[in-house]
Design a protein with these regions (language model features):
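Bacterial N-terminal signal peptides that target proteins for export
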Residues: 1-5
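Intrinsically disordered and other compositionally biased segments
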Residues: 7-10, 24
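C-terminal motif of bacterial Sec signal peptides marking the signal peptidase cleavage site
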Residues: 13-17
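Exported/periplasmic ABC-transporter solute-binding proteins
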Residues: 18-63, 72, 77, 81-84, ...
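Periplasmic-binding protein-like
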Residues: 90-94
Length: 282
């Protein structure tokens, strides 16, 4: 009987010790949680900025250890919709003024018919300018050499063109180019001569993999994907490709967001943007 009691006591002590260890481990994990003083900035940015902003983030976080930057990269139209639907966001960088205007209460009624009021207009700037280019797969097997050649080959049903959807800025620029050459997009699509991507990265991938004979993308994406750009669209063909940026009125960290926007206009950021082909406007 005594032996049985001793065994039970030892077991109880062992279990008690295990419980203590469990609590200590749990408490220890709490100490590794993010610092309460750390600020997380959430930036919604056009997919074409992925490589440059990730590089800038590394530099910025080294200089500002109490700030972490989280990006949401997608088409500007998708990002604009997510902001409308209440997604948490501190800053928006669009690949075209259209989507920014739709969130700017100071924009005219035609540009913002729903009178949406999401961005702080006092922080809005035109940050960058890009170029729209005609890119081809390695070796250019279809021998598409200019936009004019592309237009002629489409009319002759000789090639497959990759372009962005109509709600994507790069797709909207492409639509303007097709109109410039008096091409009927709906007819071409119906004939199976156009393949679409939901953002510029998808279009770029289609060209890189040779799934299309050519594609209309940004100069910076062609550079990042090591694709040959055989022609560059003029302003007459598709207008200027501007990237506006602004802090949101609903930002949880407006001061930190403004500081990051200021950094995007600084020397270190400019060097990163310009080496891939962006033109810095500020």
């Amino acid at each position: 009987m005594i032996t049985g009691l001793i065994i039970l006591s030892v077991l109880a002590c062992m279990l008690g010790g295990c419980a203590t260890v469990s609590v200590n481990v749990h408490n220890g994990s709490d100490t590794t949680a993010p610092d309460a003083d750390n600020t997380e900035l959430i930036v919604f940015a056009a997919a074409s900025m992925t490589e440059t902003l990730e590089e800038i983030k590394t530099v910025y976080e080294q200089k500002n250890p109490n700030v972490s930057v989280t990006f949401n990269f997608d088409s500007s139209g998708t990002l604009k919709t997510q902001i409308e639907e209440g997604a948490e966001c501190d800053m928006f960088i669009s690949a075209a003024p259209k989507q920014m205007n739709q969130l700017d209460i100071t924009a005219d009624k035609e540009a913002n018919p729903d009178e949406l009021d999401y961005i702080d207009p006092d922080t809005r700037i035109d940050l960058l300018e890009n170029k729209v280019v005609l890119a081809v797969p390695e070796g250019n097997p279809a021998n598409v050499t200019t936009f004019a050649v592309m237009a002629g080959d489409l009319l002759e049903q000789k090639i497959l063109l990759a372009m962005g959807n109509e709600d994507v800025p790069v797709g909207q620029y492409t639509q303007k180019i097709l109109k410039f050459y008096d091409l009927d997009e709906a007819k071409l699509a119906g004939e199976g001569l156009i393949t679409y991507g939901s953002n510029v990265k998808e279009v770029t991938t289609q060209v890189s993999e040779g799934a299309a004979d050519c594609g209309v993308i940004y100069s910076t994406d062609a550079y990042s994907a090591h694709l040959k750009a055989v022609d560059t669209a003029t302003e007459d063909m598709c207008g200027r490709v501007l990237y506006p940026a602004a802090v949101l009125k609903g930002s949880a960290h407006p001061d930190e967001a403004k500081a990051f926007l200021e950094f995007l206009q600084g020397k270190e950021s400019r060097e990163i943007f310009e080496k891939v082909g962006f033109t810095c406007l500020k």
